From Swiss-Prot:
Domain ELM2: 284-387
Alphabetical UniProt keywords: Acetylation, Coiled coil, Developmental protein, Isopeptide bond, Metal-binding, Nucleus, Phosphoprotein, Repressor, Transcription, Transcription regulation, Ubl conjugation, Zinc, Zinc-finger
Protein name, per record: Arginine-glutamic acid dipeptide repeats protein
GO molecular function: chromatin binding; sequence-specific DNA binding; transcription coactivator activity; transcription corepressor activity; zinc ion binding
Native source organism of the sequence: Mus musculus (Mouse)
Biased composition (Pro residues): 806-823, 902-932, 1027-1053, 1098-1109
Residue numbers bearing the Phosphothreonine modification: 120, 593, 1111
Any one GO biological process: radial glia guided migration of Purkinje cell
Modified positions (Phosphotyrosine) in chain numbering: 1251
Region feature (Disordered): 1-90, 464-495, 542-1125, 1154-1238
């Protein structure tokens, strides 16, 4: 007995030990599996498979044990002394199973079942019953026998598959070969339910929560304790048992508030069907019972007078009794009418048939019949008026439909909520009716409220079956799989020596260095201690860490090295590895993991906060694969677990160091993704963080697509989601950009790797990692040296796409990609050419980083993160091997840069991976170049420079880049400068290798870049500056500064204007060493970019996927020598660098000074404008007074003249030209108080100036045509003319019509007379004549007075020999038809149409002749001239009275002719021999009066003395020039085009006249 007692004691001790090990093992097993392993669907398949596997539990444990030796020791230490046994009833039924640890399992118990994979939690089930199966049935070879007490059979669980053994073969039916199996019914964890199903459940719960209290599942701990019961039964070996648990049932989510998250406790509310993948609650179960029924009081009808109860609220809608025959005839008639109406509306018989066959047509007919008291005749008469009822879709406005669809998406089919929140004007019944109409429309296919049942299997989290599992089994993996016991064996490590061997281990979650055993587990397969592993296996999540402990120093040595290397190797490697798996993972988005790869508390929070796939935190690709794509749309695959881990470590460290923990916690805002501390420079860090999002890969499906397309592996950052929305939008934009963006010259990109010669800017020193982008941020600054940076990661970074810097999202416009600064400076220079390609590249999207070629220059370690970027090199760039040569880089960069622009995605943030990791895509930070996008629109020349800009735009986060980023912010317009190609990207980098492609690009850019979206790039002038400075150094010297004429004069111009020439030069130099010579500190550069932006706040973000509501924090994030980086908005996990972060230059910095100067300048301009405005008002008042007086006089004179004679006006005041400005003469382009505008002329400016003219807007001058010239002797006389007709507009209308008819007749008569040889009028003699002395003058003058026919301002305009009869007729009728009642906009429109009509007159031979007279100075003079004569008629819009000279009418001629200083008509001036068309000449401001001495009178009083003097000088010079030109003109009459036969006589005479005069 004593021996037996001793044995029992020993057994109990052993059991205790085993129990502990078992517990550990269970927890380990449940560590981190993304998807639940397959479950066998055959009853005994699990046990059978397990038995056939012929392996012991020990062996399973050994597979995952820390070392082989330890495994061997474990095996040796497992004697068959630990016995498990079961109890039976007399009938042979097994009532309980007792393990060696004395844990008793009975049918009905809820238990944990081992899951084969270490990263998958235990499965949870309830035991239905036990049964013994003989080994022969299981085809199993039994291990060594174990012995047990006679009364029961023993099952040695730990060492071998349980076996029913009895010492002497006793035990009812027991034998050594028996296996104890159990039937279990599964419970599913939320991570084992398809994400699509669970998310809809969460949505429903949220929508139905009217209690005002938060649901219990908002607590992440309780959320993970919810299970879903199922009816699915499976058979497992008893050896798979890993402990007992408690599962409570609650009727609904509200009742679950009572649940307490105790140890081993769970709850369930709903059931789950693994076959259909549906939850009971969402599958339309029949909701019966008290909980689903409304509680209504009994009906209490109103008493009727006679005492009987009635229901007064019923409405009779049909009375049977109509004979079927009559009813059918009536319906046929109704349908016929409907068909006819449908045909009339739709235009085809088919439409009619559709209308007739609709149910609502029939219902409407029946309702009408009922309302007509069943009188078919009356009903049909009523139907004639409305045979077809108004369709439901016609009753809903577009806005209402949008709201309805929004409500469906937000609240599901909760129509009460939709009505309450979004459509209060509609009845709930209308919503339901409309829903059934809407769900049949094509739009509903993509917006269905709940399509959970149609989700593809792809989204399931259940993993693929293995060969051993039937394909159609939806259940858990066969028991054999579970018995693998991924965790170390349960009783291993018993001995001290085994623990000693493990002293070197440390848990990657809690960092403890003491544990019974060590096994990889958790969703990320990290090394865990026993406690953490078991907690994960039980609850599906790692335990929260209450007191964070610093990780042992030895844990992160490798990471530290990478960090130290800042070369970006680490990041690159990470990115590369991640990127390599560019495909999406099926699992939900991953959680970032802590440096050691463990899930940090932050990560844990993140994980708990959002549904993650079982392996959400897992970095390993395996895990992710296992994950079902719960949030596949939001998540990008993460490849290479290790790289990710290192990246994560870096990130985490940085987060803690830089207080970015918050960001990390909030899923590390995109900016933060890249650990700031890690980034070479803080600023860069920021930017890299933003990029890091890119690292993760945008979670946005679009982003993902882009990643895939780009072929560069997307770099999913742990926080993939964050970057999602923004980067996705941005990427989409980028994608939209022409593929060209890809930078056709990608090959050259690598070279830019900063020519070795170019010293990398010290500033950039730290930027080694992708962060370099930040340097780019200060692009010029560090860039020059850092060009090297690009060099640094020569190859790598060259390809670095700079994935879309954060800005990219903002930069949706092509040009942001424009200059992915990412390429080293040289790259930037090269970039210009590539830019075009960039455009095309757009598709690669921010993640395009791939450009596999990466120019993997071993090249410098690429201190910058850029190196990683190489991988960014778009696929197209892949060739960028050229990058290998730093100098070549320049070209290569171009292509690369092109690519980069394309992917400015914020992914840039990817932390600088050590250069060593060229493959890894550098964070797209480099993309800063994107920045150009916003600014690009300003100056093409900056293209080369833009790279830097792009950087800026893309890198808002990096402090150095701050200015740029802010710039980009300011320039969100970048979106508008869409095409990165802004230069005709057609320009080949090749233009000159020496010349950085960027330069070439600039050259290629059309100076007018601004004119086209593409130009947008050029327009980036402000941006240019940055690129110019920093990049130039990097780029090959060949590149000329954008400002240099060689490059592209236009681009240069803009860039120079926007920034110091030096910087411009640098920019153009791109990689030109000169850039350094223009000593623009990198910081400066970025500052300049900021300058451009001028505003610290970033512009509103471009459209992007939804993100958390931002909260204003305005906390300083990072500081550099010249600026401070502020975080303005906090969006939780999803942050946008362009709107959430901004730079503020430090007080003494150059940028601050520039901004102050800009502000001062703006103030001065505003004050000046205010003064001018006041002066203008005063002038208007004075002019109004004068106008009123003159109008009264003119009215009297007009009446007198009209009554005296049809067209003859004796009053010289009203001489033809007197009261009219030349047709389409734009009112003075500027106001007298404003100095003349010497610059290019634009129609928009002229139009604005017209509106600004005081007299134009004068109410008393409403009817004055803007194109009419003023009287030479009295410029304001015309202002009084409207008074003649203001009394009664209809009178004027009638008069105008009558006069027009009379004048036409007279003109025709005159034309006939003019054709007679004797009738000629010589201009020299005409000048001195008073208009009234000419017998025909009254007609011309009269027609001028009657504005519509306006033949011309000059009295003899219609009769000048220079006009052929047809031309005169046209001119007489050509004037715009202006009516008194016309509004100013209408008048302007009429005049514009008139100008266009006049453009057709250029076919006139004389007009063509005059076109030959265009001289180079015309254009120049036009600018001066048109702005000097402020209030005189502007020749640009002349033309009502004569052919519009191409030089006069900008609509007719090209830009060069926009401001031809004089009309093509003759000058009534003695200085000229045979004048051009006088009627046009007189309209010109210079010749508005007969003689120069009259000039002052032609200038409105508001004109200053200085302006008048200028005008006089200009007139004098113009007259002399015109006189000379006129002589030449008439000396070459043969140059005019052919003329009509009717003109032969006239032209022959004209030629003779010219000969005589000459």
């Amino acid at each position: 007995m004593t021996a037996d007692k001793d044995k029992d004691k020993d057994k109990e001790k052993d059991r205790d030990r085993d129990r502990d090990r078992e517990r550990d093992k269970r927890d380990k097993a449940r560590e981190s599996e993304n998807a639940r392993p397959r479950r066998s669907c055959t009853l005994e398949g699990g046990a059978k498979n397990y038995a056939e596997s012929d392996h012991s539990e020990d062996e399973d444990n050994d597979n995952n044990s820390a070392t082989t030796e330890e495994s061997n020791k474990k095996s040796r230490k497992k004697p068959p002394k630990k016995k498990s046994r079961y109890e039976r009833t007399d009938t042979g039924e097994i009532t309980s199973y007792i393990t060696e640890d004395d844990v008793v399992y009975r049918p009905g118990d809820c238990v944990y079942i081992e899951s084969r994979r270490p990263n998958t939690p235990y499965f949870i089930c309830s035991i239905q019953d036990f049964k013994l199966v003989h080994s022969s049935q299981a085809c199993c070879r039994s291990p060594a026998p174990a012995f047990c007490d006679p009364p029961a059979c023993s099952l040695p669980v730990a060492p071998q598959p349980p076996q029913h053994l009895s010492e002497a073969g006793r035990g009812p039916g027991g034998s050594k070969r028996d296996h104890l199996l159990m039937n279990v019914k599964w419970y599913y964890r939320q991570s084992e339910v398809p994400d699509s199903v669970y998310q809809h459940l969460v949505q429903d719960r949220h929508n139905e929560n009217d209690s005002g209290r938060e649901l219990v599942i908002t607590d992440p701990v309780i959320k993970n304790r919810e299970l879903f019961i199922s009816d699915y039964v499976d058979t497992y070996h008893a050896a798979a048992l890993r402990g007992k648990c408690n599962i409570s049932h609650f009727s609904d989510i509200f009742a679950a508030r009572e649940f307490k998250a105790r140890v081993d406790s769970f709850f369930y509310i709903l059931g789950y069907n693994p076959e259909t993948r549906r939850l009971n609650s969402t599958q339309g179960e029949i909701r019966v019972g008290p909980s689903h029924q409304a509680k209504l009081p009994d009906l209490q009808p109103f008493p009727s007078p006679d005492g009987d109860t009635v229901t007064q609220h019923e409405e009779l809608v049909w009375m049977p009794g109509v004979s079927d025959c009559d009813l059918l005839m009536y319906l046929r008639a109704a349908r016929s009418m409907a068909a006819f109406a449908g045909m009339c509306d739709g235009g085809s018989t088919e439409d009619g048939c559709v209308a007739a066959s609709r149910d609502d047509t029939t219902l409407n007919a029946l309702n009408t019949l009922h309302e007509s008291s069943y009188d078919a005749g009356k009903a049909l008469q009523r139907l004639v008026k409305k045979p077809v009822p108004k369709l439901i879709e016609k009753c809903w406005t577009e806005d209402e439909v949008k709201r309805f669809v929004k409500g469906l998406r937000q609240y599901g089919k909760n129509f009460f909520r939709i009505r309450k929140e979004l459509l209060p004007s509609k009845e709930t019944g209308e919503l339901i009716t409309f829903y059934y109409y809407w769900k049949k429309t094509p739009e509903a296919a993509s917006s269905r409220a709940h399509r959970r049942h149609r989700r593809q299997a792809v989204f399931r989290r259940i993993k693929t079956r293995t060969a051993s599992t039937p394909v159609n089994t939806p259940s858990r993996p066969p028991s054999s799989e579970f018995l693998d016991l991924s965790s170390a064996s349960e009783d291993d490590f018993d001995s001290e020596d085994s623990e000693q061997e493990l002293k070197g281990y440390a848990c990657r979650h809690c960092f403890t260095t003491t544990s019974k055993d060590w096994h990889h587990g958790g969703r990320e397969n990290i090394l865990l201690c026993t406690d953490c592993r078991i907690h994960f296996k039980k609850y599906g999540e790692l335990p929260p860490i209450e007191k964070p402990v610093d990780p042992p120093p030895f844990m992160f040595k490798p990471v530290k090295e990478e960090d130290d290397g800042l070369s970006g190797k680490h990041s690159m490697r990470t990115r590369r590895s991640r990127g390599s798996m560019s495909t999406l993972r099926s699992g939900r988005k991953k959680q970032p993991t802590s440096p050691d790869g463990r899930a940090s508390p932050i990560n844990e929070d993140i994980r708990s906060s959002g549904r993650n796939s079982p392996s959400a935190a897992s970095t390993s690709s395996n895990d992710s694969k296992a994950e079902t794509v719960k949030k596949s749309a939001k998540k990008v695959k993460e490849e290479a677990a290790s790289p990710l881990k290192s990246t994560k470590r870096q990130r985490e460290k940085v987060a803690s160091d830089t207080e970015d923990t918050d960001r990390i916690t909030s899923k590390k805002t995109k900016t933060q993704e890249i650990s700031r501390p890690n980034s070479p420079s803080e600023g860069e860090g920021e930017s890299s963080d933003s990029r890091s999002v890119n690292d993760e890969g945008s979670s946005d499906p679009k982003d993902i697509d882009q990643d895939n397309r780009s072929t560069s592996p997307s770099i999913p950052s742990p926080q993939d989601n964050e970057s999602d929305s923004d980067s996705s939008a941005q990427q989409q934009m980028l994608q939209a950009q022409p593929p060209a963006l890809q930078a056709p010259s990608g090959a050259a990109s690598a070279p830019s790797t900063a020519p070795p010669g170019t010293p990398q800017l010290p500033t950039q020193g730290p930027t080694p990692s992708a962060t370099a982008v930040p340097p780019q941020g200060s692009p010029a600054t560090s860039q020059p040296p850092n060009q090297t940076q690009s060099t640094v990661a020569p190859a790598a970074h060259t390809h670095i796409q700079q994935a879309p810097t954060l800005h990219p999202p903002r930069l949706p416009s092509p040009h942001p990609p424009l200059q992915p600064m990412t390429a080293p400076p040289s790259q930037s220079s090269a970039q210009p050419h590539p830019q075009p390609s960039l455009h095309s590249q757009g598709p690669p999207g921010p993640h395009s980083l791939q450009t596999g070629p990466l120019l993997q220059h071993p090249g410098p370690p690429q201190p910058f993160g850029l190196p990683s970027q190489p991988s960014q090199g778009q696929g197209p760039l892949g060739p960028s091997p050229a990058a290998a040569h730093p100098h070549s880089t320049i070209q290569l960069p171009a292509s690369q840069s092109a690519l980069q622009p394309q992917q400015p995605p914020r992914e840039q943030p990817l932390p600088p991976a050590p250069l060593a990791m060229p493959h890894i895509k550098p964070p797209p930070t480099t993309p800063i170049p994107q920045l150009p996008a916003p600014q690009a629109h300003k100056h093409p020349p900056h293209l080369s420079g833009p790279s830097p800009f792009s950087l800026n735009a893309n890198l808002p986060p990096p402090p150095a880049l701050k200015p740029l980023s802010s710039l980009s912010t300011h320039h969100p317009p970048s979106a508008h400068p869409p095409p990165l190609q802004l230069m005709p990207q057609s320009q080949p980098l090749p233009s000159s290798p020496a010349q950085p492609p960027g330069l070439t690009q600039s050259q290629s850019l059309p100076p007018p870049a601004a004119s086209h979206p593409t130009t947008g790039l050029h327009q980036v002038p402000s941006q240019s500056p940055f690129p110019q400075h920093p990049f130039v150094p990097g780029g090959p010297p060949p590149i000329t500064p954008p400002s240099c004429p060689p490059t592209s004069t236009p681009p240069a111009g803009p860039s120079s204007s926007s920034q110091p020439p030096c910087s411009a030069a640098v920019s153009s130099g791109g990689s030109v060493p000169g850039a350094p010579s223009c000593p623009l500190p990198a910081v400066q550069i970025k500052e300049e970019a900021l300058d451009e932006a001028e505003e610290p706040e970033s512009p509103p973000p471009p459209p992007r996927s939804p993100s958390p509501e931002p909260t204003v924090v305005d906390t300083p994030s990072h500081a550099s020598q010249s600026a401070r980086f502020y975080k303005h908005l906090d969006r939780g996990y999803n942050s946008c660098a362009r709107t959430d972060l901004y730079f503020m230059p430090l007080a003494g910095s150059k940028l601050a000074k520039k901004r102050e100067e800009a502000i001062e300048k703006a103030k001065r301009e505003a004050e000046q404008k205010a003064r001018e405005e006041r002066e203008r008002e005063k002038e208007k008042e004075k002019e109004r007074e004068r106008e009123r007086e003159r109008e009264r006089e003119a009215e009297r004179a007009a009446k007198a003249s009209s009554s005296a004679h049809e067209g003859r006006l004796s009053d010289p005041q009203l001489s033809g030209p007197g009261h009219m400005r030349p047709s389409f003469e734009p009112p003075p382009t500027t106001i007298a108080a404003v100095p003349p505008y010497i610059g290019p002329d634009t129609p928009a400016l002229r139009t604005l100036s017209e509106y600004a003219r005081p007299h134009v807007m004068s109410p008393t001058n409403r009817n004055h045509p803007f194109y009419m010239p003023l009287n030479p002797t009295d410029p304001l006389l015309a202002y009084h003319m409207p008074g003649l007709y203001n009394v009664d507009p209809t009178i004027r209308e009638r008069e105008l019509r009558e006069r027009e008819i009379r004048e036409r007749e007279i003109r025709e008569r005159e034309l006939r007379e003019r054709m007679k040889p004797g009738f000629e009028v010589k201009p020299p003699e005409l000048d001195p004549l008073h208009p009234a002395t000419n017998p025909m003058e009254h007609f011309a003058r009269h027609s001028a007075l009657t504005i519509p026919p306006a033949a011309g301002p000059h009295p003899f305009a219609s009769f000048h020999p220079g006009l052929n009869p047809l031309e005169r007729e046209r001119l007489a009728l050509a004037g715009p038809q202006l009516r008194p009642e016309m509004s100013y906009p209408d008048r302007l429109a009429a005049e514009r149409i008139h100008a266009e009509r006049m453009a057709s007159l250029t076919s006139d031979p004389l007009a063509r002749l005059q076109m030959f007279n265009v001289t180079p100075h015309h254009h120049q003079h036009s600018h001066i001239h048109s702005h000097l004569h402020l209030h005189q008629q502007d020749p640009l819009h002349q033309g009502s009275a004569g052919p519009v000279h191409p030089l006069v009418d900008p609509l007719t001629a090209g830009p060069h002719l926009a401001r031809f200083p004089y009309p093509p008509g003759t000058l009534p001036n003695p200085l000229l021999g045979q004048p051009p068309h006088e009627h046009e000449m007189l309209r010109h401001p210079v010749f508005g009066t007969p003689y120069p001495r009259d000039l002052p009178g032609a200038i409105p009083p508001p004109m200053s003395a200085a302006h008048q003097l200028q005008a006089m000088h200009a007139q004098s010079a113009e007259l002399q020039r015109l006189a000379m030109e006129q002589q030449w003109l008439h000396g070459h009459p043969h140059m005019h085009g052919g003329h009509l036969p009717s003109q032969e006589d006239y032209y022959s005479r004209l030629k003779k006249e010219g000969d005589k005069q000459l």
